């Protein structure tokens, strides 16, 4: 089991566990520099990120805002900016957390796009949804929500000349816990390689409120299961996923779930196949 843990961790470029606060600060500096270099390489000046109210988008948003603030100071170019985007589906049940995230990030600009009308309009036109069991239809529409959110972010980025930031990290990547070409689509993923507790450590060091740092993660895509916890979908806890990624002991059953899920979702982590 240890060898396959190492193989998967290497494939996902998992970062070593943090030993000290200096390790956390080094990762913050590294990821801010990464964001800045992506902007410089692209020739663009704007970053776009959807803010959900969860710790992942909060952390990525804090990194993004710091990145552009430093670029403005270093270069004297005031065109560098970060746009934080709220993308609720009708009324979001944890909207207060999303607003608290925005207040913490203090982005240069905030926009709101309610995806409810677009999702409903598309769902009404899809003959493929007719006759489906309610749970299956709800799942498919949940993925539509994620993809519409990414369409909106890329529309803003296209209009403003920017790059779209993703929030994927190693704990989600190993489980394939993202919508293909939805929240899995982005131009840069500054949280890549981090375990879930490491994302929380960065958020905490960046000044995020503890209630948002330790908030129970949920994709919240399905109407029939509002606020459904990620861990309930995984069948394992984030603590177990993190232990697996760092080559630490964990329940054999949990390790098997993670390995099986990793293989089943491999297609999500690959580019489209070609002849």
From Swiss-Prot:
Question: Its Gene Ontology molecular function terms?
Answer: ATP binding; glutaminase activity; metal ion binding; NAD+ synthase (glutamine-hydrolyzing) activity; NAD+ synthase activity
- Any single biological process term in GO: NAD biosynthetic process
Q: Where does Mg(2+) bind?
A: 56, 172
Q: Cite the annotated pathway.
A: Cofactor biosynthesis; NAD(+) biosynthesis; NAD(+) from deamido-NAD(+) (ammonia route): step 1/1
Catalytic activity reads: deamido-NAD(+) + NH4(+) + ATP = AMP + diphosphate + NAD(+) + H(+)
Q: Which Pfam families match?
A: NAD_synthase (PF02540)
Claim: Disulfide bond is one of the keywords in the record: no
Q: Which keywords label this protein?
A: ATP-binding, Ligase, Magnesium, Metal-binding, NAD, Nucleotide-binding
Any coiled-coil ranges, and where? none
The EC class name is ligase
The record's EC number reads 6.3.1.5
Give the CDD domains listed for this entry: NAD_synthase (cd00553)
Output a single Gene Ontology CC term carried by this record: cytoplasm
- The question of whether NAD is a record keyword is answered with yes
Q: Which InterPro entries match?
A: NAD/GMP_synthase, NAD_synthase, NH(3)-dep_NAD(+)_synth, Rossmann-like_a/b/a_fold
Q: Which residues bind deamido-NAD(+)?
A: 147, 180, 187, 267-268
Provide the residue positions that the database annotates as binding ATP: 50-57, 167, 196, 218
In the record, the note on similarity to other proteins reads: Belongs to the NAD synthetase family.
Q: What does this protein do?
A: Catalyzes the ATP-dependent amidation of deamido-NAD to form NAD. Uses ammonia as a nitrogen source.
Q: What quaternary structure, including any partners, is listed in this protein's UniProt entry? A: Homodimer.
The protein's name: NH(3)-dependent NAD(+) synthetase
């Amino acid at each position: 089991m240890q060898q396959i843990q190492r193989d998967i961790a290497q494939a996902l470029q998992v970062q070593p566990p943090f030993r000290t606060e200096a390790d956390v600060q080094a990762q913050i500096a590294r990821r801010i520099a990464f964001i800045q270099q992506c902007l410089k390489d692209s020739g663009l000046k704007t970053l776009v990120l959807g803010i959900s109210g969860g710790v992942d988008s909060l952390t990525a948003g804090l990194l993004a805002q710091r990145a552009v603030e430093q670029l403005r100071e270093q270069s004297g170019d005031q065109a560098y900016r970060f746009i934080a985007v709220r993308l609720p589906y009708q009324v979001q049940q944890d909207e207060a957390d999303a607003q608290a995230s925005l207040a913490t990030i203090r982005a240069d600009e905030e926009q709101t796009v309610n995806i409810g009308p677009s999702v409903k309009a598309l769902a009404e036109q899809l003959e493929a949804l007719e006759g489906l069991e309610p749970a299956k239809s709800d799942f498919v529409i949940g993925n539509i929500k994620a993809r519409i959110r990414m369409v909106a972010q890329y529309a803003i980025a296209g209009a403003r000349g920017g790059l779209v930031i993703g929030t994927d990290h190693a704990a989600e990547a190993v489980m394939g816990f993202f919508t293909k070409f939805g929240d899995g689509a982005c131009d840069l993923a500054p949280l890549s390689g981090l375990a879930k507790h490491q994302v929380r450590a960065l958020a905490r060091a960046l000044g995020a409120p503890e209630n948002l740092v330790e908030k129970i993660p949920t994709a919240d895509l399905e109407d029939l299961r509002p606020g459904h916890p990620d861990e309930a979908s995984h069948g394992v806890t984030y603590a177990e996923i993190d232990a697996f990624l760092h080559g630490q002991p964990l329940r054999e059953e949990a390790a098997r779930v993670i390995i099986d899920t990793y293989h089943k979702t491999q297609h999500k982590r690959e580019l489209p196949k070609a002849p």
